[in-house]
């Protein structure tokens, strides 16, 4: 029998133990009763950061800014990826302007920047906007079935 996955709620930051076999069944948070695995990216804030990157499912973070043209053109690609990767990888967005206290320590040098976290650690980073097939290939190269 496989161990349940520990997945932080994107709404209240509460930790949830979800049986791996039930990941595709739209599990709800035990604390706030909202869906834990979203088919769209969620907004990451400083207060949530440490807890959110530690979940058992990988977290792909898109660091962006309102004024950034490539960020805006990449947003629909990231949204589509979120809908296709439910249960495989969680996708979050970090507005680098509104969250400078977090973007700074992450060492963001250009945007958009993607940072992939597994088990609380950064495992990969990629800058720039690219099409969905290239994003999925990049994720597969880091062990995520996309």
Please report, for each region that a protein language model flagged, where it lies by residue.
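A short beta-strand-turn-helix
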Residues: 41-59
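Short pre-active-site segment immediately N-terminal to redox-active cysteine/selenocysteine motifs
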Residues: 57, 64-67, 110
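Thiol-based oxidoreductase modules, predominantly thioredoxin-like and allied folds used
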Residues: 63, 78-82, 86-101
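Short cysteine-rich clusters marking metal-coordination/redox-active sites
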Residues: 9-12, 29-32
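Non-catalytic, surface beta->alpha helical segment in thiol-disulfide oxidoreductase systems
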Residues: 110, 115-146
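Cys/His-rich microdomains that often coordinate metals
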Residues: 16, 36, 75
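Short linker/helix segments within small regulatory modules
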Residues: 18-27
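Conserved redox-active cysteine motifs that mediate thiol-disulfide chemistry
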Residues: 63-77
């Amino acid at each position: 029998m496989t161990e349940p996955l520990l997945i932080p709620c994107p709404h209240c930051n509460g930790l949830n133990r979800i049986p791996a076999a039930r990941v595709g069944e739209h599990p709800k948070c035990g604390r706030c009763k909202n869906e834990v695995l979203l088919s769209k990216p969620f907004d990451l804030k400083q207060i949530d950061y440490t807890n959110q990157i530690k979940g058992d499912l990988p977290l792909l973070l898109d660091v962006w800014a309102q004024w950034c043209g490539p960020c805006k053109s990449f947003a629909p690609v990231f949204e589509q990826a979120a809908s296709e990767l439910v249960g495989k990888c969680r996708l979050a967005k970090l507005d680098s302007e509104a969250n400078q206290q977090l973007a700074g320590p992450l060492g963001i040098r250009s945007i958009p920047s993607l940072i992939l976290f597994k088990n609380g650690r950064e495992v990969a980073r990629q800058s720039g906007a690219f099409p969905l097939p290239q994003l999925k290939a990049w994720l597969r190269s880091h062990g995520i079935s996309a």
